[in-house]
Amino acid sequence: MEKKVEAILEFDKIKKQLTEFASSSLGEQAILELAPATNFQVVQKSQLETEEGAKIIRLRGSAPITGLTDVFAHLKRLEIGGDLNGLEIYQIGSNLRVSRQMKNFMTDLLEMGVELPLLGALSDELLVLKEVEEDIAISVDESGKILDTASEALSTIRRTLRRTEDRVREKLESYLRDRNASKMLSDAVITIRNDRYVIPVKQEYKGHYGGIVHDQSASGQTLFIEPQSVVDLNNERKALQAKEKQEIERILAEISASLAGWINEIHHNTFILGRYDFIFAKARFGKAMKAVTPHLSDAGIVHLIAARHPLLDAANVVANDIYLGEDFTTIVITGPNTGGKTITLKTLGLLTLMAQSGLQIPAQEDSTIAVFEHVFADIGDEQSIEQSLSTFSSHMTNIVSILEKVNHKSLILYDELGAGTDPQEGAALAIAILDASHEKGASVVATTHYPELKAYGYNRVHATNASVEFNVETLSPTYKLLIGVPGRSNAFDISRRLGLSENIITEARSLVDTESADLNDMISSLEEKRNLAETEYEEARELARGADALLKDLQKEITNYYQQKDKLMEQAREKAANIVTKAEVEAEEIIHELRTMQLNGAAGIKEHELIDAKTRLGKAKPKTINKTIPQAPKQKPHVFQVGDNVRVLSLGQKGTLLNKISDKEWNVQIGIIKMKIKTTDLEYIQPETPKKQRIITSVHSSDSPVKSELDLRGERYEDALQKVDKYLDEALLAGYPQVAIIHGKGTGALRTGVTEYLKNHRMVKSIRFGAAAEGGNGVTIVEFK
């Protein structure tokens, strides 16, 4: 891509704005070197990196990249055996810390299931040098000062040095507190001269303290004297400072030698972190601009929805739809100057450069932009004074250069094509240049104010007209691009609005040839119809967006509903299974108990014990519970067709096939909802055959073999209870409201057992002994619910 084109389209201003979002000089340097790529796969990867960066910003707000520094020069010094200073070592340690934090940050995101194939792969390349990082952290602070914890020797030296300095200050402060201090000292302060502690003594008392004079005031009236009593202490202090310096140099050399063994790893970490900073800068820039990741086309197709020029005020800029490469490859934008035609050219050109640089573009979702090998632009007055070229000559020189380099993977932007010369010749040249550009296979957008080019879009199948809307009421352009509508002259309307006599306007109209006037009237009518259609389209699109949002909400609610339903069903099944298991265990225990009683012999068992055990066995029997989910019988393979009735397995709902999206997916109508369903999630439902109407009759009839009474006299206890259980079921099915159980009076054991059993039967409403006429207490009357 030519740098000249980047300058014309003001791509450098985009890069300048982008640098404000970088966190380090490494990110800024990557931005300064940024240039549009021309390889489709490279552009695709760059866009995916930016999209992944944007995903991270959406999820986490930021990334732990703060603290990254350019340390490549430091590593060069280590490479040749040099030692680093404290600040340089700290900066390398800071990069190691950022490397570790960034790797942990990315690991957390990946473990959460966030799809980050490119940025995740970058984090795999980061090497964590925890020990080296910790050695630096305990040795150097952010200002580059060597810490006491760097070595035991340094800590000891500094403790001794502090004590020595305290002794010096204490001795000098005693002079300041002396009662004669105000007379002999110019000021009651301790200061430093030549790195020695001194006090300011008046000239006439210089011999009082002895010692060494290190300096004097400008007037000579004050001498800065190191008293003899602290000379030795100051000497000791200087010696300790020398030891401190020597130990610091040793520590720096030791750390430098350690870092020298990791030069390649630190270099690569720093490079990777610089890439991260660059990618996150692109993502934050896109967010600030409310930009989107475009679809990319390697077939020259452009379909920008509500595209905005990124350098214009976002609150006032007019968004336009721009499409090219499908129905036509050339757009000729006609109409008067100052109508916003050039802005359209620059918007398309600049957004193309941005997209091919891996930047998101200011447009709506689902916008598509092409990847071109070349972008050429002949925009503005590039007249060269040095070359003494006219405007026309300058443009023509540029166009000649473009036509020499252009190919089928090129985008050409011509501004005011053919301008600067005789209108008739200029229009003819413009048409010939457009034809030549098309023959080379290029995609072209050109602006012109020549009316002769209005016919170009109609006469060439590869071309279409366009114009920028003009509001006659306000006498200003709306900057709205109208593709398919040629520009028209508004001179008469504007003149009338400005007060020109109607007679003059009428005469002027008569001088315009009829064909031209009819064309302008036709264009005017076409504009009105287009505006109406566009308004209705926008309203329809807004309704469609609302309906789409509602559909997505409904689909989400339906999915949540069935997920919750499945969850509750699963919980119910588990609970039911537990009840059944518990009941089975309890029943087995009771049966075992009964068998034990039988083995012990009836003589040793009381009747009420048997009754109690049998009753507990009845209670242990649970209500019928399905422990397994009914499985649909396996069907023969069915070739799905439009209109088939199906069951959506994941939702448990029936639906109808609307249309086939692919071999793996269908559109299915489920009630009022239309959903995309995978073929593997569908089960064919056979059409139901009409069923014959059945006449339902009463369960019991006059010739029912079930009697209204059961005679148990002479029966053994266990056999009697089994007969009662079976008889009650038959009586219920026969429809009896009540029945009689004849058990006799006897010892009362059978009567007691039957009574206890009936009390616990779920279908028995009440029981009573029979009246005298019914058999007295030898009969139990049972009333059903």
From Swiss-Prot:
Its EC number is 3.1.-.-, 3.6.4.-. One of its GO terms (biological process) is rescue of stalled ribosome. GO terms for molecular function: ATP binding; ATP hydrolysis activity; ATP-dependent DNA damage sensor activity; endonuclease activity; mismatched DNA binding; ribosomal large subunit binding; rRNA binding. ATP binds at G335, P336, N337, T338, G339, G340, K341, T342. Keywords: ATP-binding, DNA-binding, Endonuclease, Hydrolase, Nuclease, Nucleotide-binding, RNA-binding, rRNA-binding. Residues 710-785 form the Smr domain. Endonuclease that is involved in the suppression of homologous recombination and thus may have a key role in the control of bacterial genetic diversity. Homodimer. Binds to stalled ribosomes, contacting rRNA. Belongs to the DNA mismatch repair MutS family. MutS2 subfamily. HAMAP family: MutS2. This is Endonuclease MutS2. The gene is mutS2.
